[in-house]
């Protein structure tokens, strides 16, 4: 049982009511190679750690960043690179991260951008006036579109997907706030070792081109997102 939340293009429900997206397709292929049939469930993202630790789900697989959470879970991957970025309205005078000083930003709750802006541990991220943490990711985009906030921060692929789906006129800042790997999280108390086999399977899928084939359906420069070796530098 795979837990995730609605996060296009990684994880969403298609027009026929079926699970779809990058992570869904990767999971189906990887687990079928391993002899499992995945079942996808939508979870309360804020409660993900409890759900996996209690065994209500077997793993968390939905564009989940490894960085800073390395010791919280047993990880498979990282299988993809992701850039956490800041987006503003086209007309905004914000062009670089330092321009965010004393501005209002919206993020999805329990995500890396929320942590980065609230904890202020990275010197390149200025102190903002206010951080709005929203459980529903759609609300961050609505807040920006209506001008309630000055900026939003999220995974670049997800922002670009929203811009494409809704013809939203946002501008993504050149400086990212974090380059991170995305992985599949299993509970620390899970002794089955599935994550090790899954890591090997995902690597094999990158090697044989099947991961790239899946990504190409959703993003234009698939190779860029599979260069996870750059995280080891």
PLM segments and residue spans:
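Short glycine-rich His-centered loop
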Residues: 1-22
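Periplasmic-binding protein-like
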Residues: 4-5, 81-88, 164-203, 221-233
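Acidic, polar ligand-binding/catalytic clefts
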Residues: 24, 28, 32, 37-99, ...
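Short helix-initiation/N-cap motifs at beta->coil->alpha
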Residues: 24, 39-50, 130-142, 146, ...
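Extended ligand-binding regions for polar small-molecule ligands
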Residues: 21-33, 94, 98-104, 109-112, ...
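A conserved helix-loop-strand patch within extracytoplasmic ligand-binding domains
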Residues: 36, 44, 76-127, 131, ...
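Ligand-binding cleft/hinge of the Venus flytrap
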Residues: 12-15, 27-36, 113-134, 161-167, ...
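A ligand-binding cleft/hinge motif common to bilobed small-molecule-binding domains
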Residues: 47-50, 63-72, 116-119, 143-179
């Amino acid at each position: 049982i795979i837990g995730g939340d609605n996060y296009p293009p990684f994880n969403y429900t298609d027009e026929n009511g079926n699970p779809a997206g990058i992570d869904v397709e990767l999971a189906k292929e990887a687990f079928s190679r391993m002899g499992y049939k995945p079942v996808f469930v939508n979870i309360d993202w804020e409660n993900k750690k409890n759900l996996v630790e209690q065994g209500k789900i077997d793993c968390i697989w939905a564009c989940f960043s490894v960085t800073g959470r390395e010791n919280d879970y047993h990880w498979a991957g990282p299988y993809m690179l992701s850039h956490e970025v800041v987006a503003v309205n086209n007309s905004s005078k914000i062009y670089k991260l330092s321009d965010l000083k004393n501005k209002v930003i919206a993020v999805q709750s329990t995500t890396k951008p929320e942590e980065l802006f609230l904890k202020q541990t990275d010197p390149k991220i200025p102190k903002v006036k206010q951080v709005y943490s929203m459980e529903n990711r759609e609300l961050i985009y609505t807040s920006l579109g209506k001008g309630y906030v000055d900026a939003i921060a999220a995974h670049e692929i997800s922002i670009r997907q929203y811009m494409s789906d809704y013809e939203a006129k946002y501008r993504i800042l050149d400086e990212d706030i974090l380059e991170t790997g995305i992985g599949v999280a299993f509970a620390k108390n899970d002794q089955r070792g599935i994550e090790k086999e899954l890591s090997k399977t995902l690597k094999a899928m990158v090697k044989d081109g099947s991961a790239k084939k899946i990504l190409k359906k959703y993003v234009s420069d698939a190779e860029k997102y599979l260069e996870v070796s750059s995280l080891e530098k």
